[in-house]
C-alpha cells in the first residue's frame, strides 16, 4: 500500500518511492510499514472486527530475523481489552498446532523476577546507575531507551527458556498508541523462545490523542536526527469521530511460522 505520509514511529523508518516521474507529475509516496492506519480508517467508519494479512515494508532493517519486506497479520477486536486479545492469540496458536506452554507476566513482574529491578518506580538516574554497573552505555536522554536497553540485556535472554511468553502493561513512556492508565500503558508483546512475534495495544480512540502521540514521536525523531517528515493529516481528518473501544495486534508471519516449526 502506498501512503501520502510516512510512519511517525521513532524506531521504524518508511521506504519512500517516487511515482509518475515519466509523466512529469512526480510525487513522493511511502510504502506502508503496517496496515494499521488504513485499518483504523475502516474502524472509524463502522467496519467492526477486522483483520488483514499483507506485505509490509521497512527501511534500515537487516539481520537474521529482520527484513525490509515481510508478511504481517493485523487484527482488531471491538470491545476487547488486551487480556482478552492475548487469550485469543493463544487460541490462534493452538489452532496452528502449538501445544507449547504459555506464560503471562506484566512488564514489572518480568523485571523483578529476572533482575530484581523495580522498573516502574525507578527513575532515569536509578536506571543509568544499573546500566553503568553492567558496563552498558547509559548516554540516553529518555528513560524508555534505558528501559528497552535493560530489557534486551537482562530479560530477553531469559525469555529464550520460555516457549511462549506474553508480557503486558509496559511503562507509560513506551505507550506508542496504547491507552495509558497510571504508570502503565495497556500494551503487550508476545515472545516465542525469546523472539518477539507480536505487538498489541488497547487502542487510543480520539483524533486528538493520535495527533498528540504522533507529534511526540516526530519530535523524538527530530532529536535523533532521523527524517521526521510530517503528520498524516488525512488520517486525522478521517478519525474526527474516533474509533470504537478496541484492541489490536500485529503478528510477524514469517517469524511465527519459523518458530512454530521448531
Question: Language-model features: where?
Answer:
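Mid-sequence acidic-hydrophobic segments that form the walls
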Residues: 45, 56, 60, 92-99, ...
Amino acid at each position: 500500500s502506498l501512503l501520502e505520509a510516512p510512519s511517525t514511529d521513532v524506531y521504524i523508518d518508511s521506504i519512500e518511492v517516487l511515482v509518475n516521474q515519466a509523466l512529469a507529475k512526480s510525487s513522493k509516496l511511502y510504502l506502508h510499514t503496517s496496515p494499521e492506519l488504513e485499518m483504523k480508517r475502516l474502524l472509524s467508519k463502522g467496519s467492526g472486527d477486522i483483520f488483514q494479512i499483507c506485505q509490509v515494508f521497512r527501511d534500515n532493517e537487516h539481520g537474521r530475523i529482520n527484513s525490509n519486506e515481510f508478511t504481517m497479520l493485523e487484527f482488531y477486536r471491538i470491545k476487547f481489552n488486551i487480556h482478552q486479545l492475548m487469550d485469543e492469540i493463544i487460541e490462534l496458536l493452538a489452532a496452528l498446532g502449538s501445544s507449547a506452554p504459555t506464560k503471562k507476566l506484566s512488564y514489572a513482574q518480568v523485571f523483578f523476577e529476572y533482575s530484581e529491578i523495580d522498573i516502574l518506580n525507578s527513575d532515569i538516574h536509578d536506571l543509568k546507575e544499573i546500566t553503568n554497573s553492567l558496563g552498558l552505555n547509559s548516554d540516553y536522554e529518555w528513560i524508555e531507551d534505558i528501559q528497552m536497553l535493560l530489557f534486551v540485556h537482562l530479560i530477553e535472554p531469559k525469555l529464550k527458556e520460555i516457549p511462549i511468553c506474553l508480557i503486558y502493561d509496559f511503562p507509560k513512556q513506551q505507550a506508542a498508541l496504547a491507552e495509558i492508565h497510571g504508570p502503565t500503558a495497556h500494551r503487550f508483546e508476545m515472545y516465542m523462545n525469546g523472539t518477539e512475534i507480536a505487538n498489541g495495544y488497547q487502542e487510543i480512540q480520539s483524533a486528538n490523542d493520535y495527533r498528540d502521540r504522533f507529534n511526540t514521536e516526530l519530535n523524538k525523531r527530530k532529536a535523533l536526527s532521523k527524517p521526521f517528515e510530517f503528520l498524516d493529516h488525512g488520517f486525522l481528518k478521517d478519525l474526527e469521530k474516533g474509533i470504537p473501544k478496541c484492541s489490536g495486534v500485529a503478528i510477524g508471519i514469517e517469524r511465527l511460522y519459523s518458530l512454530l516449526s521448531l
